[in-house]
């Protein structure tokens, strides 16, 4: 994985891993189990940012963070699918493969640059050809249609583009959470 990724990228206002920022303004969503004390502490300060998960409604909620990319940030729309895959290939060739211990694994078995490639409607054939021609450089690739952020409920990243999105963005108002004040009454750690 390229760093910063996941939650760390939210804290730093950075794009996640090898990916450019999703758009100038977007929603970044993370799943959280309702039983996690740290989530309950967060939700107490920011209930407006949480909702029931459509994928695990019995156990999980989704936290929606409003993200605004820095002015000079590279955005998803600034790269086409092939340009993005070239970056993934470059990092795989120059970082992942040379950084591995060849004696700790089977030959030609490598870690992967975690990636989701956004593909525009006119790019699918070229992307398929590129992946096939360069298959030795990829361990795994997730492909997502260009409008995937609007096609899937509670997508991990969703562009703020409609009036409804703007209203949602304006309603989030994150409040700082002082985690130094968090106390757990019981030890929830399960060692196995």
Question: Over which residues does each language-model region extend?
Answer:
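Catalytic alpha/beta core of large soluble enzyme barrels
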Residues: 4, 12-192
């Amino acid at each position: 994985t390229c760093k910063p990724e996941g939650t760390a990228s939210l804290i730093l206002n950075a794009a996640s891993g090898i990916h450019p920022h999703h758009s100038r303004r977007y929603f970044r969503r993370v799943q959280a189990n309702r039983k996690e004390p740290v989530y309950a502490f967060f939700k107490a300060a920011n209930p407006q940012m949480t909702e029931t998960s459509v994928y695990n409604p019995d156990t999980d909620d989704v936290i929606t963070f409003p993200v605004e990319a820095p002015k000079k940030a590279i955005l998803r729309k600034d790269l086409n699918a092939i340009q993005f895959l070239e970056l993934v290939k470059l990092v795989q060739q120059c970082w992942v493969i040379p950084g591995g211990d060849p004696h700790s694994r089977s030959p030609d078995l490598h870690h992967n640059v975690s990636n989701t490639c956004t593909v525009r409607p006119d790019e699918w054939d070229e992307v398929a050809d590129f992946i096939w021609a360069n298959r030795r450089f990829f361990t795994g690739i997730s492909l997502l249609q260009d409008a995937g952020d609007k096609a899937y409920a509670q997508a991990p990243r969703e562009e703020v583009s409609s009036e409804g999105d703007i209203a949602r963005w304006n309603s989030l108002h994150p409040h700082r959470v002082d985690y130094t004040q968090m106390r757990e009454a019981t030890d929830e750690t399960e060692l196995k």
